Amino acid sequence: MTTVGTSSVPCLASDPSRGHSGDVLAIVAPGQGAQKPGFLSDWMSDATFSDHLAWLSAVADIDLVTHGTTSDEATIKDTAVAQPLLVAAALATAWSVDPEIFSQADLLAGHSVGEIAAGAAAGAFSTEAAMVLVRERGRAMAEAASRTATSMTAVIGGDADEVLTAIKAAGLT
């Protein structure tokens, strides 16, 4: 999760009538692709972080400690691993920075799978529910992608007519 300092951009969260000074604490959880081999290694020396990551691993029934510290790139790119790993990393790093950080945040958001971490942080559902949800979501998406090469496809940019022609040529809808 990325903590984005303060902002002077006018928004509802910085409205003085709502008790805000004008500074806004926004926490944004990343989506799949933010993970790198060993990206959690340095965090493991922090007891708050390592305890939370171990607990989240147990809840998800996935060894997220190993995946965040020693698993190779191919392993952590697997959607079934990457998604629970990213949600757990977002929650554990934020709690390590400040155990009360989510209650202090003015804005919580997430990109793609990061929305699950943001939802748990906002109290929309429990942390345990978030970890079970993201585990099942990751497994389902990995299974769908393994059945058909184009079952999990995204188009980023390009000329609209060319993109539509390519989609049609591939037999996709």
Regions found by a protein language model. Name each.
Residues 1-21:
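Actinobacteria-biased recognition of intrinsically disordered, low-complexity terminal regions
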Residues 14-109, 171-172:
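Helix-rich "cap/lid" substructures immediately adjacent to catalytic or cofactor-binding pockets
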Residues 32-34, 60-62, 72, 121-173:
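Alpha/beta catalytic cores of group-transfer enzymes, especially the acyltransferase/condensing modules
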Residues 36-38, 66, 115, 119, ...:
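Basic, gly/Ser/Thr/Pro-rich low-complexity segments located predominantly at protein N termini
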Residues 55, 89-92, 116, 129, ...:
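Residues within well-formed alpha-helices
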Residues 90, 106-114, 118, 126:
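Gly/Ala-rich beta-loop-alpha elbow adjacent to hydrolase catalytic centers
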Residues 96, 100, 119-125:
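Alpha-helix C-terminal capping segments
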